[in-house]
Amino acid sequence: MLRFATFIIAMMAMSGIAGAQSFPADILNTPVDGSVASWIIRTFGLLTVLSVAPGILIMVTSFPRFVIAFAILRSGMGLATTPSNMIMVSLALFMTFYVMAPTFDRAWRDGIDPLLKNEISETDAMQRMSEPFREFMVANTRDKDLQLFIDIAREKGQTVVVDEKVDLRAVVPAFMISEIRRGFEIGFLIMLPFLVIDLIVATITMAMGMMMLPPTAISLPFKILFFVLIDGWNLLVGSLVRSFI
């Protein structure tokens, strides 16, 4: 976990460097020539990039698929706040660390570690760190989604394929679309058994003339019992982790 924390901090710093290459090296040193306004603008720009970096890092990992599946599970069971958002996000984060461990290790070994040893420049380190993530995203992105952004770039006269490698500008949005789609596909399969339980309970209550009684109030205990009996968390988490290449 310590390596993961260090990796994320380094990625945030490197994202700031990559997004603000025009900033001088002494950006955090107060200017003495009176250019306070320029210094404030540069500092604000760097802090803005650093604040966005964690969100960017999450979007290029397996995190979105996990969160979508957990949210649909909670909705299908009819539970409004249980498990809480904090629990679901925390579980999704730790599952992301587990799935992305090989990618993190490679990015650390190829990019961050040589940079800390002053063996490569910041630009080279950023390229080496992004390569494992690019390969992970390409492997888990539908060809149709990836081709969509390649075609859009071609229509605008832009080139996103260099030396048979697709640029991150096309890979990241294509990967996110694919992840959202897969999350909904998994969510549909999760919802089906709970929908069947709701229909059975609703049919029984209607046959008994209890039309004023909400079927969800009766079906909720049965859905929870069903999920526990089939060891739902084990099946769901195992399927989600194995769904990644």
From Swiss-Prot:
Its biological purpose: Plays a role in the flagellum-specific transport system.
Biological-process GO terms, alphabetical: bacterial-type flagellum organization; protein secretion
Entry similarity comment: Belongs to the FliP/MopC/SpaP family.
Keywords for this protein: Bacterial flagellum, Bacterial flagellum biogenesis, Bacterial flagellum protein export, Cell membrane, Membrane, Protein transport, Transmembrane, Transmembrane helix, Transport
Membrane-spanning ranges: 4-24, 44-64, 84-104, 186-206, 210-230
Listed GO CC annotations: bacterial-type flagellum basal body; plasma membrane
Subcellular location: Cell membrane; Bacterial flagellum basal body
One Pfam entry name: FliP
Signal peptide: none
Protein name: Flagellar biosynthetic protein FliP
Organism: Rhizobium meliloti (strain 1021) (Ensifer meliloti)
InterPro entries membership: FliP (IPR005837), T3SS_IM_P (IPR005838)
Membrane association type: Multi-pass membrane protein
